[in-house]
């Protein structure tokens, strides 16, 4: 009886915290089960699809339970966003990641040791450092959260060797429970996660991956651009269009805008202020379509996305499912559309060679790095260097794509950490106390305006390094961004603040001392096995796109080990099976309409067929028949007699 009462009291406290800080009346799905499991000190694995509310499952118990919750995540931009949002709610949160100064790291860790922080976000490569391990021993740790837990599994689609250090730091706090969270995991990965994190007992909570409100569509089309506009005109509401390259993002956004549909684009290469502005415009529905690389979407809270379109085919079903799942989080009808044709098959197969260059090439890149940075044998461990891939490739006559892949392989093998898109925003911490600040000799009016803007917009400035937006300060102080930068530098020189300017450059950190290139070990697990897994994932993605016999939703669920007995009745496969075959009369009408369009002897773009206002199934059959019988001809996207 006492145990039941204690359990109810704990649940009431969790629910009260949820209402107080997040405004939700109750937990949803398996959130409550996961929270109660971790509160009882049990190692727990939570499988929650995109939009399932993962962050609630560790943020709520972190506030209720004594001590600090350490959150391990590879997504630096996401951890910064979450820390900012938590601080805005009055919650003490901090982050440690590659690119921070030693002084910043020590200050942050000491705040955790002395009880000033409830949630500490850490990037996995920081777990290797002696500073972290020393301070971690002295922390009162409530539990450890491992976000994106599939990254610890060699069978996962995004394996990161730095995650293997989690099991090592667990030995420093053997009584602290582990909460592992992922949105995408096959049965094999589920078992591997629990084994590699040394779960004391298997304990899995899973939400069904079924999205009954989301219609999965594959469109086989040679003219993706026209089909995209056709889809955007057919489905109203907010949309995301995913592409693979930064240039493609800007090109497609321009193309959509030219069709009088408001669009912008987003990728990791944009300045933080530009990213924030574009993201806010899209979230507030000032812009309808966001064209983006896979850098966009993590942690984005926008439930009313009605459409997600992939113009370029992702490398894996895991990646596709996660990105497609950003549509329809409000539970209302939404669509996930993959535009596909035979050229995508060739592109996917080409990516194998790009992602897995020959071993000798990987070793050559490792040697060239050492020459580039003048790192001698048996030295270099812990050193970080700014890395300009274009300059490096010009120096040693390498190709950027293969070089990028070689560096990732070296990272998986544990030789380096390669941070490709750091988001090193400017940071400030006051060196003076609040009372000392008010007793300062009078500075310039500009300095006072900047200090006032800092105090008005940011909390925690006297105890933590806080991320700042110099453009926001400029707006508040009625100055230019450059003037704000100069003033912050002056305040730092006067020992009023610690100021770390914005820096956005990829960098490489040596995780161990340099060895000779011929002694670099690329094990079967790191290279051959990973390559085979990559090929298997690409094959699975191709099979999904080209399988027109099995319900799309059922295909996805089977891939993730979830059996489904009913078809969704809303994907393109299900609708094709239920739509009636065109009659002979309809087929003849469609053939005549196509021939009539082409009778002028000109080359006509295939998109003009949409203007015939004929049923798609009948039109497709008629087109296939006419091309097969050579009554008409297809050259790229153009039809002619």
How would you label these PLM feature ranges?
Residues 1-3, 120, 253, 608, ...:
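Intrinsically disordered, low-complexity N-terminal extensions of nucleic-acid-metabolism proteins
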Residues 2-21, 25-29, 33-55, 62-65, ...:
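Helicase motor core with emphasis on the C-terminal RecA-like subdomain
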Residues 23, 233, 611-614, 624:
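Amphipathic alpha-helical interaction elements
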Residues 212, 504, 637-638:
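Beta-strand-connecting loop/turn residues
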Residues 358-514, 519-622, 629-634:
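C-terminal accessory/connector segments of nucleic-acid motor ATPases
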């Amino acid at each position: 009886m006492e145990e039941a009462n204690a359990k109810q009291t704990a649940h009431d406290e969790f629910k009260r915290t949820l209402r107080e800080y997040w405004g939700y009346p109750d937990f949803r799905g398996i959130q409550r089960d996961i929270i109660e499991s971790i509160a009882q000190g049990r190692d727990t694995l939570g499988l929650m699809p995109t939009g399932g509310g993962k962050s609630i499952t560790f943020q709520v118990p972190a506030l209720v339970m004594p001590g600090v919750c350490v959150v391990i995540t590879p997504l630096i931009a996401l951890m910064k966003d979450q820390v900012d949002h938590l601080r805005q709610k009055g919650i003490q949160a901090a982050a440690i990641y590659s690119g921070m100064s030693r002084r910043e790291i020590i200050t942050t860790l000491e705040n955790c040791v002395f009880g000033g922080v409830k949630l500490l976000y850490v990037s996995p490569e920081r777990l290797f450092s002696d500073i972290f391990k020393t301070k971690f021993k002295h922390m009162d740790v409530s539990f450890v959260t491992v976000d994106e837990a599939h990254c610890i599994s060699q069978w996962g689609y995004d394996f990161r060797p730095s995650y293997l250090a989690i099991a090592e730091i667990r030995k420093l706090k053997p009584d602290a429970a582990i909460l592992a969270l992922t949105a995408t995991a096959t049965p094999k990965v589920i078992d591997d996660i629990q084994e590699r994190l040394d779960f004391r007992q298997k304990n899995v909570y899973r939400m069904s991956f079924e999205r009954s409100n989301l219609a999965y569509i594959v469109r086989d089309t040679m003219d993706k651009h026209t089909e995209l506009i056709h889809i955007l005109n057919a489905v109203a509401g907010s949309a995301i269009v995913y592409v693979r390259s930064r240039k493609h993002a800007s090109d497609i956004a321009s193309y959509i805008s030219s069709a009088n549909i408001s669009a912008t684009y987003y990728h990791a290469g944009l300045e933080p202020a530009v990213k924030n502005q574009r993201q806010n415009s899209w979230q507030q529905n000032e812009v309808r379509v966001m064209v983006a690389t896979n850098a966009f979407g993590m942690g984005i809270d926008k439930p009313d996305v009605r459409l997600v379109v992939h113009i370029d085919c992702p490398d894996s079903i895991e990646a596709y499912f996660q990105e497609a799942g950003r549509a329809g989080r409000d539970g209302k009808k939404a669509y996930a559309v993959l535009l596909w044709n035979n050229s995508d098959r060739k592109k996917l197969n080409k990516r194998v060679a790009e992602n897995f260059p020959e071993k000798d090439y990987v070793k050559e890149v490792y040697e060239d790095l050492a020459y580039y940075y003048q790192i001698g044998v048996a030295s270099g461990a812990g050193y970080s260097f700014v890395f300009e891939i274009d300059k490096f490739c010009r120096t040693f006559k390498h190709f950027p794509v293969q070089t990028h892949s070689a560096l990732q392989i070296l990272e998986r093998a544990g030789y380096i950490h390669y941070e490709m898109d750091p988001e090193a925003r400017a940071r400030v911490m006051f060196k003076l106390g609040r009372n000392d600040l008010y007793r300062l000799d009078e500075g310039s009016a500009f300095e006072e305006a900047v200090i006032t803007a800092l105090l008005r917009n940011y909390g925690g400035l006297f105890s933590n390094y806080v991320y700042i937006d110099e453009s926001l300060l400029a707006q508040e102080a009625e100055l230019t961004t450059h003037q704000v930068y100069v003033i912050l530098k002056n305040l730092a020189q006067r020992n009023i603040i610690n100021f770390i300017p914005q820096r956005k450059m990829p960098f490489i950190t040596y995780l161990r001392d340099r060895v000779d290139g011929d002694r670099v070990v690329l094990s079967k697990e790191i290279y051959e096995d990973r390559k085979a897994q990559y090929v298997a994932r690409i094959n699975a993605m191709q099979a999904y796109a080209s399988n027109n016999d099995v319900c799309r939703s059922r295909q996805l669920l089977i891939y993730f080990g979830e059996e489904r007995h009913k078809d969704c009745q809303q994907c393109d496969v299900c609708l094709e099976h239920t739509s009636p075959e065109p009659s002979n009369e309809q087929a003849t009408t469609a053939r005549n309409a196509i021939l009539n369009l082409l009778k002028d002897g000109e080359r006509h773009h295939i998109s003009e067929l949409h203007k015939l206002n004929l049923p798609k199934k009948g039109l497709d059959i008629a087109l296939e028949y006419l091309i097969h019988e050579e009554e008409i001809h297809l050259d790229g996207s153009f039809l002619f007699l």
